Design a protein with these regions (language model features):
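N-terminal leader/linker segments that precede catalytic domains of diphosphate-processing enzymes
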Residues: 1-115, 122-320
């Protein structure tokens, strides 16, 4: 049975619409209008168009952050993807850890990104759930009322090198240089931060779980479902992704199926500053990256060898 970790009133969340200006060299945004709650924000996320993907000025519904999180585990690097049922779009995708930026953090989106890692990527050990550090700052423990966090061996979260083109919040340049794109179907500005998560070697065995909030009966509810970890690892080779997905439970990697899988729009092609797609099929993304799916493991080769052996015995019997 899924375990309820927390309930929130969505009306407590407030954000602001944005005015965004983009040129081929940089992008800037600033808040406009009146604060909106979660429901009002969803209602405002309607498709927009821009005449030139490199140069435009437009008003958008909200600011979102995503984290392309690289986990180092047993001397290998993996990207972290999480499963999400997107209630506002009626689909299920694998996406980067992500969330909405509240009004008071519009000029500090990195702070929101760090909190999203703490909320959506849960690391379990036999002694409890790992706490985390970003540089010298403790990450929040969002489910401390329901889960036992251990501080003795925290994971560490560090920023990686950012995108080439700068992004400004008002007159303030975001030092971490997140990748930015305007998602036209939802009229939102999205910032993607590259981060690395190191798990202490002593914290073994580990299991990884994803927890996300769902809107239920006018409440935001977060549940932990052990039978559906909903967190997937994509292995990297020399920094490039491989066409494989795994879940991790008690230090054991288990392959995850990819049939009919869709990835969120952050994996789709970006044209200038804009992304036009709602989502992208797993197979199409592999093709876009120049990859092919791994061949399915079958017993054909083993069966063929056995058949040859039997054929040899049969021939031997006939020649006698």
């Amino acid at each position: 049975m899924p375990r309820t970790l927390i309930r929130k009133n969505p009306s407590n969340f407030k954000t602001l619409p944005l005015f965004v200006e983009a040129t081929p060299e940089s992008l800037s945004y600033q808040s406009v209008g009146m604060p909106m709650n979660f429901t009002q924000t969803l209602q405002r996320r309607r498709k927009v168009e821009v005449p030139d993907p490199e140069r435009f000025a437009t008003e958008l519904a909200n600011l979102g952050v995503s984290i392309r999180l690289t986990i180092s585990w047993q001397n290998r690097d993996y990207w972290v993807l999480v499963r999400q049922r997107r209630q506002d779009r009626g689909d299920v995708v694998l996406k980067l850890i992500s969330g909405y930026v509240p009004a008071h953090e519009l000029t500090l989106p990195l702070h929101t990104a760090i909190q999203e890692v703490a909320e959506e990527c849960l690391i379990e050990t036999p002694q409890g759930w790992l706490s985390g550090l970003f540089k010298d700052t403790w990450l929040p423990a969002p489910y401390a009322s329901a889960l036992h966090y251990r501080e003795a061996m925290p994971f560490t979260l560090t920023p990686l090198s950012g995108a080439a083109r700068p992004v400004r919040a008002g007159n303030l340049t975001l030092l971490e240089r997140p990748r930015a794109y305007v998602h036209l179907p939802t009229a939102s500005l999205q910032l993607i931060y590259d981060m690395r998560l190191e798990i202490p070697k002593e914290a073994r065995p580990i299991s990884l779980f994803h927890v996300d909030e769902m809107l239920e009966n006018d409440q935001l509810v977060a549940r932990l479902n052990r039978s559906k970890p909903d967190l997937y690892l994509m292995p990297l080779e020399n920094g490039s992704p491989l066409p494989e997905l795994y879940t991790l439970k008690r230090d054991k990697l288990s392959p995850a199926g990819t049939r009919g899988l869709y990835l969120a729009e952050s994996f789709a092609a970006q044209d200038g500053w804009v992304v036009r797609e709602e989502r992208i099929r797993w197979k199409d993304w592999l093709r876009q990256q120049g990859m092919t799916p791994p061949p399915k493991k079958t017993g054909l080769k083993r069966l063929t060898s056995k058949a040859r052996e039997l054929l040899g015995l049969a021939r031997g019997s006939l020649s006698k």
